[in-house]
Amino acid sequence: MAPVDIPDRDRLIVALDLPDLRVAEAMVDRLGDSVGFYKIGYQLAYAGGLPLARALVGAGKKVFVDLKLHDIGNTVARGVESLSHLGASFLTVHAYPQTMKAAVEARGSSKVKILAVTVLTSYDDRDLADAGYRFGVRDLVEARARQAQAIGVDGLVCSPEEAAHLRSIVGPEMDLVTPGIRPAGAAAGDQKRIMTPAKAIAAGASYLVVGRPVLDAPDPKAAADAIVAEIAAARGS
C-alpha cells in the first residue's frame, strides 16, 4: 500500500511544463486552491522558473524540482546543496549508485526528499536494448529500486505499470511517484507506459504527475478537480 497520510489534493502533482515564467504563474493562478503540488522541470527551470519554486513554497504550495541530476558525485552533491535552499519537497536524480549516494549525503539537514528515476516512462524494452542494456524495463527497474532503497533514497519515480511490483519490493515507506498518468480518453502523447489515476493509486502509487491533461484542458481547474476526485474515489476517501 502507498503511504496513507497524504491528502488527496497533494497526491496530484501538476507538471508546469510551460515555456516561460509568466505563463507558469498564470497557470498557477488559474488552478488556485485545486492544486497544492507543482513540478518544475527542465523547460521552466531553464527559462528562469526556479525563483517560482521559492514563491510557491512561500504561498504554502509544495514543489518538486525535477532536474534528474546525473554527474560525478561531487558535482551532484554541489547541485543538491544549492537546490535544497529552494524549499522543495522533492528533487530527482538518476538511479545510479554514485549519483544517489552523493545526493542523499549532500542534502544534509534539509527536508528535501531525494527521488531516484528508475527508467523513463518513454522507454520500453526495445529502447533499452538499443542503448546497450542487457535488461528489460522490469528487471532494470527492480534492480535500481533495490539499490535506491539500500542507499537511503526516499522514493522512486517509476511508470504506474511498475508501481504494484515495486510496492511489493520496497514496502510501504518509500514514495512512488508516477508520471505517465492519463485520465480516460486523454491522448498518450510520447508516453509508452501509461495508466489512469484510479488504477495508478490502486497499484500503490503515492503521487501522480500530470501535465498536459491539465495544462491543455479547456478548463484546467476542472480537470485538476476531476483527477483529485478520481484519486479520492480510488482511495475510498
Curated annotation (Swiss-Prot):
Coiled coil: none annotated. GO terms for biological process: 'de novo' pyrimidine nucleobase biosynthetic process; 'de novo' UMP biosynthetic process. Pathway: Pyrimidine metabolism; UMP biosynthesis via de novo pathway; UMP from orotate: step 2/2. Substrate binds at residues 17, 39, 66-75, 121, 182, 191, 211-212. The active site is at K68 (proton donor). Its EC number is 4.1.1.23. Keywords: Decarboxylase, Lyase, Pyrimidine biosynthesis. InterPro entries: Aldolase_TIM, OMPdecase, OMPdecase_AS, OMPdecase_bac, OMPdeCOase_dom, RibuloseP-bd_barrel. SMART domains: OMPdecase. GO terms for molecular function: orotidine-5'-phosphate decarboxylase activity. GO terms for cellular component: cytosol. It catalyses: orotidine 5'-phosphate + H(+) = UMP + CO2. Catalyzes the decarboxylation of orotidine 5'-monophosphate (OMP) to uridine 5'-monophosphate (UMP). Belongs to the OMP decarboxylase family. Type 1 subfamily. Homodimer. This is Orotidine 5'-phosphate decarboxylase. It comes from Rhodopseudomonas palustris (strain ATCC BAA-98 / CGA009).
